[in-house]
Amino acid sequence: MPRNQRIAFVTGANKGIGFEVSRQLVREGFRVFLGSRNAEAGRAAARKLNREWKDQESVFFLEIDIAEQESIQRAAAEFARQSNRLDVLINNAGILLDDDKDILTTTPEIFEGTLRTNTLGALLVSQAFLPFLRKSDAPRIVNVSSGGGQLTDGADGWAPGYCISKTALNGVTVQLAAALPDFSVNSVCPGWVRTDMGGANATRSVAEGASGIVWLAADAPQSETGKFWRDRKVIPW
């Protein structure tokens, strides 16, 4: 690996937005660690991208379940065996469990599970990979959030656990940005994207959804931090 090659780790990257983000980062010249809790799917995704680029050294699979602390620690230990530096962490993995619930009918199990993955998971991964990020000349953390987490637009009652978890993730972003002044730490809304989560009627392709994430990871000014973005513009939350 060239010394100046940037290194990224993308969680939830075996399909959907995370897979496309990984693809676009390879195109930008990154070495990518592709995270997935499903080992078979993750390895297949990494092989697919390496075949696309005819380069077996571009994408590496890293097994991780961000809802499990032990899995996060194992992933960090495995990463350390392959690299001592990380330039960009993209906390993309997330779940949607309550799109058929409202705030009056959601259950403790759904609510706690959603927050554990979408909010706490992103924080714990950031903490675990912080030693590697500190070795970068320009470390970045990108948290994939959602317009559903915007309080400024008012709640419409849809998927309360999911939306609240994304509001809280934006809060984590602000806290991390304050604690890590030499880092660029941002949240981003990819828009309504045609994925398993977004559904077939969504208005954006995965390539369009990934674009803003990749921009924050690769090209946005390092001085931009603690903000919430969509389409390369800061939005309120």
Regions found by a protein language model. Name each.
Residues 2-33:
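Canonical Rossmann dinucleotide-binding motif of NAD(H)/NADP(H)-dependent dehydrogenases/reductases
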Residues 167, 182-183, 187-193, 199-237:
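C-terminal helical subdomain
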Residues 39, 62-75:
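The beta1-alpha1 cofactor-binding region of Rossmann-like NAD(H)/NADP(H)-dependent oxidoreductases
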Residues 90, 125-129, 133, 172-173, ...:
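Hydrophobic positions on the long internal alpha-helix
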Residues 95-115, 123, 134-181:
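Catalytic loop of short-chain dehydrogenase/reductase
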Residues 28-44:
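Conserved glycine-rich Rossmann-like NAD(P)H-binding loop of the short-chain dehydrogenase/reductase
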